Swiss-Prot record:
SUPFAM superfamilies: Class II aaRS ABD-related, Class II aaRS and biotin synthetases, ThrRS/AlaRS common domain. The keyword ATP-binding applies. It is found in: Cytoplasm. Zn(2+) binds at residues 302, 353, 479. It comes from the Bacteria. Pfam families: HGTP_anticodon, tRNA-synt_2b, tRNA_SAD. The gene is thrS. Residues 209-502 are annotated as: Catalytic. This is Threonine--tRNA ligase. It is an enzyme of class 6 (ligase). CDD domains: ThrRS_anticodon, ThrRS_core. Catalyzes the attachment of threonine to tRNA(Thr) in a two-step reaction: L-threonine is first activated by ATP to form Thr-AMP and then transferred to the acceptor end of tRNA(Thr). Also edits incorrectly charged L-seryl-tRNA(Thr).
Length: 617
C-alpha cells in the first residue's frame, strides 16, 4: 500500500539511521519525476522480494525524502546477502521494461484478488479504503493496492542509480502489540552521479551523528538500566548545557522576560481542565497516587504558566507579561521512534508565554522573532525556512480574533523582512502559528522554533484582566519555544559543528601539554591562572610523547592545545596550536588569558591574535 495512505506507516523499531540532506535537483520537468521513480522502485523491490521469497507478505511501501522502503512479513530475517540478491533481481525486472498500469476495481474484486494471494495485511488495508479501489500492476503478474503515481514503464528507472541500504524492524501500524515486520530501505535517483552524491552526504551525516560524537567526546549517554529515552549529561556535556542555559537566560532578561520555575507533576484535575487528558493522554505517563490524590508528570509547561497568571487579579496596565522557563517535561515515545537526543522521553522545553492585549500582538511577535534570531545566530544558524499556518475548518475562537491574530503574525514577519510560506488551514484548532526550520552545515532542515497563539487555554482557565473601562477581558496568549527541546537542539548543534564546537562553547577550551616533568609545576600554575580567569583548562599528565598528546587532543576536538617546554616556561608562555587556525606561535600567558576572556565574552568561535606579535617575533 503506497501513496496518500502514508499515515499507516509503522514506526521503526530498530536503530534509526542518521538523517541526511536530500540532493538538490535541478528545477526541470524531469526532476519532478523523482517521487514517481522512488515510488515505482518500491514496487519493483516488492516484486523482487516476493519472487525470491514466496512466503513474504507485503504491507506498505511509500517513497521518502531520500528514497523508499517497503515493510514485509517474512519468516526469516533478511541478510546482507539477501539484499544483494534482491537488488540483482530488481535490475532484471527493470531490464524487462514492464509497464506500470493503474486499474480501478470494486471492493469485491479487490477482496477476491487479495484472498487469492492470501495477503491478510492487504485485506486489513482494504477495510480503510473507499471506492473506487485503485491497483497498480507491474507487468502481468504482480500488483498492489496503490493510489500512485508511478512511472509508465520500468525503462524509465535507471538501474545504476539505486541502492538497497539497510533492513530495520517495524511494527504493523506502528503498534508494538502487532506483528513485527522487516523494513527494507532503499534510495533511488535519476542519475548515477546523484546516487554518488547521496552516498557522500550519507557518509558525512554519519560522521556528524550526535550519538557517536556524544560517546566519543564524553558528552552524554542513555543508560538502559535507567530506561529508554532518559538522558544522562556527563560533566563535559553538562558544562556545555550550562553555558547554553546561561546565555538563554541572559538573552531573555535583556529581552524583557522574567523567569519561572514550576513543578514537574500536577494533580490529574489540572490535565482535565487543560484538555491534555482529552487530546494528549497517549503521550503522557500514567498517574501516580499520593495521599489519595492522583498526579501525572507534566508533558507541557503551559498550564503551569496559566495558573501563575491566574494567581492574582491582572490589569491591562501590566500587559504584556512575558514569562519564560527551562522546564523539564515528560512524554511517552514509542520505542521505535526514539533517536539519541532528537526524540527522548524526558527533555527540557524552553517555553515562554506572553499574555498581551489584542493590539499588542504584532509588536510582541516581532520581539519574539528578534530574540529567536539573536539566539539561533549565536550558534551559527542563520538560514531559516518559515511557515505561517492559518485557521483550519474546525477551530475555536471568534473569527474576528483569528483574523486579528493572523494579521499580527503576518505584519510582524513583514516588519522583520523574513520570507515565509502560508499553510492555509494548517493551524491548530486553538490558534494560528509560525514554525521555523533551521538549515545546518550540510543542508538539512530541522524544525526548531514555534510561535503559537492560543485561544483555548485562556478560555478553559477563564483567564482575564481588568480593561481600561473596568470590564473583564480575555488576554491573548502566545506560546513560544526557540530551541524547542534543549536536548534536541543540542543534538542538532552537535551535528552542525561535527563536534568541533566554537571556543566559547567548548567544554574544555585549552589543554596544556607539558613536554617534560620539569615544566609540570609551571603548567599547574598556568592552569590555575586560566581557571581563575574563567577559562576551562586542563593538563595532560600522561607523560606520553608530544605527538601522541597532540593526537589525543585533536581527537577530543580541543580548540587550543598549549605545548609547554623549558623554553616556553622560561618565557612565561606556551606554543599554541588551534583546531581552526593552525599554529598560533608562542604566546605569553597574559596575552592568552586576555584573548580567551575576550573570546568568551563575545562568544567567538576561535582565538584571534591579530595585530599582535608572538614572543618569538
Amino acid at each position: 500500500m503506497t501513496g496518500p495512505e502514508q499515515e499507516m506507516v509503522s514506526s521503526v523499531a530498530a536503530t534509526t539511521p542518521a538523517p541526511i540532506a536530500p540532493v538538490v535537483l535541478p528545477k526541470t520537468s524531469e526532476s519532478e519525476n523523482l517521487l514517481k521513480i522512488r515510488h515505482s522502485m518500491s514496487h519493483v523491490m516488492a516484486m523482487a522480494v516476493q519472487k525470491l521469497f514466496p512466503k513474504a507478505q507485503v504491507t506498505i511501501g511509500p517513497w521518502t525524502e531520500a528514497g523508499f522502503y517497503y515493510d514485509f512479513d517474512n519468516p526469516e530475517p533478511f541478510t546482507e546477502a539477501d539484499l544483494k540478491a534482491i537488488k540483482k533481481e530488481m535490475g532484471k525486472i527493470i531490464g524487462r521494461k514492464l509497464p506500470l498500469e493503474r486499474i480501478e476495481v470494486s471492493r469485491e474484486e479487490a477482496e477476491r484478488r487479495i484472498k487469492a494471494q492470501n495477503e491478510p495485511y492487504k485485506l486489513e488495508i482494504l477495510e480503510r479504503l473507499v471506492e473506487p479501489i485503485t491497483l497498480y500492476t507491474l507487468g502481468e503478474q504482480w500488483w498492489d493496492l496503490c493510489a500512485g503515481p508511478h512511472v509508465a514503464n520500468t525503462s524509465e528507472l535507471n538501474p545504476k542509480a539505486f541502492e538497497l541500504e539497510s533492513v530495520a524492524g517495524a511494527y504493523w501500524r506502528g503498534d508494538e502489540t502487532k506483528a513485527q515486520l522487516q523494513r527494507i530501505y532503499g534510495t533511488a535517483w535519476e542519475t548515477a552521479d546523484q546516487l554518488s552524491e547521496h552516498k557522500r552526504r550519507k557518509e558525512e551525516a554519519l560522521r556528524r551523528d550526535h550519538r557517536r560524537l556524544g560517546k566519543d567526546l564524553d558528552l552524554f549517554s542513555i543508560e538502559d538500566e535507567a530506561g529508554a529515552g532518559l538522558v544522562f549529561w556527563h560533566p563535559r556535556g553538562a558544562r556545555m548545557r550550562l553555558l547554553i542555559e546561561d546565555f538563554w537566560r541572559q538573552a531573555h532578561f535583556e529581552g524583557g522576560y522574567e523567569l519561572l520555575y514550576t513543578p514537574h507533576v500536577a494533580d490529574i484535575s489540572l490535565w482535565k481542565t487543560s484538555g491534555h487528558l482529552d487530546f494528549y493522554a497517549e503521550s503522557m505517563f500514567g498517574p501516580m497516587e499520593v495521599d489519595e490524590r492522583q498526579y501525572q508528570l507534566k508533558p507541557m509547561n503551559c498550564p503551569f504558566h496559566v495558573l501563575t497568571y491566574a494567581s492574582k487579579l491582572r490589569s491591562y496596565r501590566e500587559l504584556p507579561i512575558r514569562w519564560a522557563e527551562l522546564g523539564t517535561v515528560y512524554r511517552y515515545e514509542r520505542p521505535g521512534v526514539m533517536h539519541g537526543l532528537m526524540r527522548v522521553r524526558g527533555f527540557t522545553q524552553d517555553d515562554a508565554h506572553v499574555f498581551c492585549l489584542p493590539e499588542q500582538i504584532s509588536d510582541e511577535i516581532l520581539r519574539i522573532l528578534n530574540l529567536t534570531e539573536r539566539i539561533l545566530s549565536t550558534f551559527d544558524f542563520s538560514n531559516y525556512e518559515i511557515n505561517l499556518s492559518t485557521k483550519p475548518d474546525k477551530a475555536i475562537g471568534d473569527d474576528a480574533v483569528w483574523e486579528l491574530a493572523t494579521k499580527g503574525l503576518i505584519e510582524a514577519l513583514k516588519r522583520k523582512g523574513w520570507a515565509y510560506k502560508i499553510d492555509e488551514g494548517g493551524g491548530a484548532f486553538y490558534g494560528p502559528k509560525i514554525d521555523l526550520k533551521i538549515e545546518d552545515a550540510i543542508g538539512r532542515m530541522w524544525q526548531c522554533s514555534t510561535i503559537q497563539l492560543d485561544f483555548n487555554l485562556p478560555e478553559r482557565f477563564e483567564l482575564d484582566y481588568i480593561a481600561a473601562d473596568g470590564s473583564k477581558q480575555r488576554p491573548i496568549m502566545i506560546h513560544r519555544a526557540i530551541f524547542g527541546s534543549l536536548e534536541r537542539f543540542f543534538g542538532i548543534m552537535t551535528e552542525n559543528y561535527a563536534g568541533d564546537f566554537p571556543f566559547w562553547l567548548a567544554p574544555e577550551q585549552i589543554r596544556l601539554l607539558p613536554v617534560t616533568d620539569e615544566v609540570l609545576g609551571y603548567a599547574e600554575e598556568f592552569q590555575n591562572q586560566l581557571k581563575a580567569a574563567g577559562i576551562r583548562a586542563s593538563i595532560d599528565r600522561s607523560g606520553d610523547r608530544l605527538g601522541k598528546l597532540i593526537r589525543i587532543g585533536e581527537k577530543m576536538k580541543i580548540p587550543v592545545l598549549a605545548v609547554i617546554g623549558a623554553k616556553e616556561a622560561e618565557q612565561g608562555a606556551a606554543s599554541l596550536r588551534s583546531r581552526r587556525d593552525g599554529d598560533l606561535g608562542v604566546i605569553t600567558k597574559e596575552r592568552l588569558i586576555a584573548t580567551a576572556q575576550s573570546a568568551n565574552q563575545d562568544r567567538k568561535a576561535s582565538l584571534s591574535f591579530d595585530n599582535s606579535v608572538s614572543v618569538e617575533e
